[in-house]
Amino acid sequence: MPTIQQLVRLRRIQITKKTKSPALVNCPQRRGVCTRVYTTTPKKPNSAIRKVARVRLTSGFEVTAYIPGEGHNLQEHSVVLIRGGRVKDLPGVRYHIVRGALDSGGVKDRTQRRSKYGVKKPKS
């Protein structure tokens, strides 16, 4: 336990938490423009072709974002909404594109977990 005089001389240090999504700059989502849309392969034990996009954000950062769901309509110059959330088997991919927002369409023929993929309730 420090004395009051020691605290006057050298105050207690605040523990700063390092953010996992620095490009969002304390916002829940950010808008950006796709500069490149391409596919990549995951790390070792997994095997797939994952769809990703390089996005220039309004905060000035250029990040790699994952495109979730089956099929997409994104191309270069598409305006997209980015949220945090990494993809465990893709190194360097720390953001997700929000489906159904701005230029990104919802996933076709999706009936379950629709809210996560930007799909309206089907007419029954």
From Swiss-Prot:
GO terms for cellular component: chloroplast; ribosome; small ribosomal subunit. It comes from the Eukaryota. One of its GO terms (biological process) is translation. Keywords: Chloroplast, Plastid, Ribonucleoprotein, Ribosomal protein, RNA-binding, rRNA-binding. Coiled coil: none annotated. Gene3D superfamilies: Nucleic acid-binding proteins. It is found in: Plastid, Chloroplast. Part of the 30S ribosomal subunit. This is Small ribosomal subunit protein uS12c. Residues 104-124 are annotated as: Disordered. Its main location: plastid. It comes from Thalassiosira pseudonana. One of its GO terms (molecular function) is rRNA binding. Belongs to the universal ribosomal protein uS12 family. CDD domains: Ribosomal_S12. PROSITE patterns: RIBOSOMAL_S12.
